Amino acid sequence: MRNVKNIDCDLCVIGGGMSGLCAAVTAARLGLKVVLVQDRNVLGGNASSEVRMWIRGAGLHFSEYREGGLIEELALENMYYNPDMNYSVWDGVLYNKVVSESNITPLLGATCVGATCDGNVIKSVSAWGLQSYNSYEIYAKYFADCSGDCILAEFINAKIMSGRESKDMFGEPMAQDECDGMTMGNTCMVQLRKGKQKPAPPLPFTSDLTERVQRRIDIKNNNWDRENFWWLEFGGDDDALHNAEKHNDTAVKAAFSAYSTIEKHAGDDFDM
């Protein structure tokens, strides 16, 4: 029997990445009742332990680019609770930030599957609990699409913009001359640690990436156990959303190929 739960709130936030988390916490502190719908079981999106793309990278080299506000608040709490900078503990820091706000109802492991409108006004969104098998119908005065891929636009036929804008579009002198469809790509999380076993034969589906990796990094002298492989990214020049399965296959093959290449040339053995 289908279990449907109806929820009323002031603001429904779709997506629990850093933008969705900040939107939910800020709104809750302003007194709004918030429902946060996140299709993963951890918060943070690409900054979570699932992908491990650390936030505020520019601030490491240029202090004036360091973000303040809620991001700084999270960074300070992370230093206090997580001095070893462990990503699993970072997940806990983000989770604590949300559950500490009594005005937020988090729905983790729930994915947005539809929306209803009255004219051009969104009245509710539908979500599906991937583990609980609960269906949620969330009614709100306001909705924030922080999914990263404009998932609500798919359900309500809203106009969206994708790609890189031109200089003339918003008066940005540092933008490119012509707009195009280039977006962020897809990746998969890869980490290496020093092992004790002799290098194993490469898997049959891998390729030798010696030339391509060496072009970017000194294979023999890099600290591979501290590398997060942010440069393994695919699909930005394609439809990174609707062709995600294809790009996932490419990313997995590239990850194992890079690992085999490093094992071959680095001088140390690594476990993946």
Labelled PLM ranges:
Residues V4-G17:
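Beta1/beta-strand and adjacent pyrophosphate-binding region of the FAD-binding site
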Residues D8-L11, L30-K33, E101-T105, V121, ...:
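Loop/turn elements at helix/coil->beta-strand transitions in domains of secreted/extracellular proteins
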Residues I14-G17, V37-R40, G109, W128, ...:
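Active-site-proximal beta-strand/loop segments in catalytic clefts of secreted hydrolases
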Residues G20:
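N-terminal Rossmann-fold NAD(P) dinucleotide-binding loop
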Residues T26, L32-K33, V37-T116, M161, ...:
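Conserved N-terminal/central alpha/beta ligand/cofactor-binding core
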Residues N46, G109-C112, V121-S124, Q131-Y142, ...:
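Flavin (FAD/FMN)-binding glycine-rich loop and adjacent Rossmann-like elements that form
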Residues L76-M85, S124-S126, D238-L241:
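Helix-loop-beta segment of a Rossmann-like dinucleotide-binding subdomain
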